[in-house]
Design a protein with these regions (language model features):
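Active-site acidic carboxylates
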Residues: 1-96, 162, 166, 174
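Catalytic metal-binding/acid-base residues of hydrolase active sites
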Residues: 14, 51-53, 100, 125, ...
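Histidine-anchored nucleotide/phosphate-binding helix
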Residues: 33-40, 131-141
Length: 177
């Protein structure tokens, strides 16, 4: 691993992606590992949160995927085990986003991928938001060492999770298994 400034990006660990409308057994299974990763992380941490408001905007996502992560609902909130750890790390940022990647941010800190030498991603969904953010990080910061902790990610299905990991690996992103 490179030495230098480190960032852990915790992607969309929200109730709707874990236990709710878009949840899965695989997503539920990663919660303890993500919690431990955050607890022992030695660097900055950024949490992203998918966020939609009512009435839903006329976007492809809102037509293609069931309504989810409606701001202010239980489904929108970070899962309890992750929120508890977030509360133990004052000063870490939450980026609320309306798109798959952090460039859709409407509120949040000014954390930028270019500011880091080592970036690691965990969370949901491997094949949507995790891959989007990881590829943008690769594009924004071609010199960073970028990692995906495959055991701390879950996709929309086990097959799509594996496909996304393969694509990221082919784009010079380290996939740690």
């Amino acid at each position: 691993m490179k030495t230098g400034k480190k960032l852990l990006v915790v992607v969309d660990m929200q109730n709707d992606f874990i236990y709710g409308r878009l949840g899965s057994k695989e997503a539920q299974e990663i919660v303890p590992a993500v919690r431990e990763k955050i607890r022992h992380w030695d660097g900055d941490i950024m949490f992203t949160m998918d966020s939609h408001t009512l009435p839903l905007k006329d976007t492809f996502e809102n037509h293609a995927i069931r309504p989810h992560c409606i701001e202010g609902t239980e489904g929108w909130k970070l899962v309890y085990d992750i929120k508890e750890i977030y509360d133990e790390h004052p000063g870490q940022s939450i980026k609320v986003k309306e798109k798959y990647n952090r460039f859709g941010i409407t509120r949040g800190s000014t954390t930028r991928y270019i500011d880091y030498d080592y970036i690691e991603f965990v969370g949901t969904c491997t094949d949507i938001c995790v891959i989007s953010n990881a590829l943008i990080a690769r594009s924004e910061n071609p010199h960073a060492e970028i990692h995906i902790d495959a055991n701390c990610c879950a996709g929309t299905s086990p097959e799509m999770h594996e496909e996304a990991l393969n694509v990221m690996s082919s784009c010079l992103i380290y996939v740690d298994r």
